[in-house]
């Protein structure tokens, strides 16, 4: 299948590595897979500012708790890069929180990003700190999903050693597109497939 190939320790689409969200150093913007266009089109959307992030979350271009949290984290970074003013940042943070008021990951990611803002630092330094923190949130999510995959693989192996056929049922938005890479409940399935 064109969307699920983990042979290279990542999700591939047409043999090209993709994550659901990433920071592009060249264009200095955040990029996402626009999930409203799937499965018929693969559209990469650039998030250049706070408004772009708000639209991406509200219009469900990004879906799944971990991905929404990461997008919100990048939203704090992009808002600071754009605004730099303390009062305007407080308003921007509230706008981000209002995009999905029940999304727990969104709130903890925003609070984590806000905890890194120290207005006694130079603006460029704060920007760098916020970008590093948003990227760190993404890396931590990928690491969590990989660990879920590794641990889940052991469970699948143990069960499949006892039976010939194994059916796995997942629910909710637990796949690759809900996280940065791998997925939560689906990560063990990907690991099992690649490790026969």
Predicted segments with their positions:
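N-terminal active-site beta-alpha-beta segment that forms phosphate/nucleotide-binding
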Residues: 61-196
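Short, Lys/Arg-enriched N-terminal segments with co-localized hydrophobic residues
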Residues: 1-10
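Positively charged, low-complexity intrinsically disordered leader regions
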Residues: 11-51, 55
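General secondary-structure edge motif
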Residues: 2, 33-40, 93, 132
């Amino acid at each position: 299948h064109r969307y699920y190939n983990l042979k290279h320790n990542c999700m591939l689409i047409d043999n090209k590595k993709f994550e659901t969200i990433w920071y592009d150093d060249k264009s200095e913007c955040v990029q996402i897979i626009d999930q409203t266009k799937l499965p018929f089109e693969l559209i990469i959307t650039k998030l250049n500012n706070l408004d772009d992030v708000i639209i991406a979350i509200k219009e469900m271009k990004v879906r799944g708790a971990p991905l929404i949290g990461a997008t919100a984290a990048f939203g704090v970074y992009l808002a600071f890069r754009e605004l730099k003013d303390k009062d305007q940042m407080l308003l921007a943070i509230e706008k981000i929180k209002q995009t999905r008021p029940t999304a727990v990951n969104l709130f903890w990611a925003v609070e984590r990003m806000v905890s890194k803002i120290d207005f006694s630092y130079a603006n460029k330094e704060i920007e760098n700190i916020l970008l590093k923190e948003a990227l760190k949130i993404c890396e931590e999510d990928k690491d969590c999903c990989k660990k879920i995959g590794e641990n889940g693989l052991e469970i699948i192996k143990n069960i499949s050693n006892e039976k010939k056929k194994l059916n796995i049922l997942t629910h909710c938005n637990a796949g690759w597109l809900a996280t940065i890479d791998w997925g939560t409940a689906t990560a063990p399935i990907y690991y099992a497939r690649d490790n026969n």
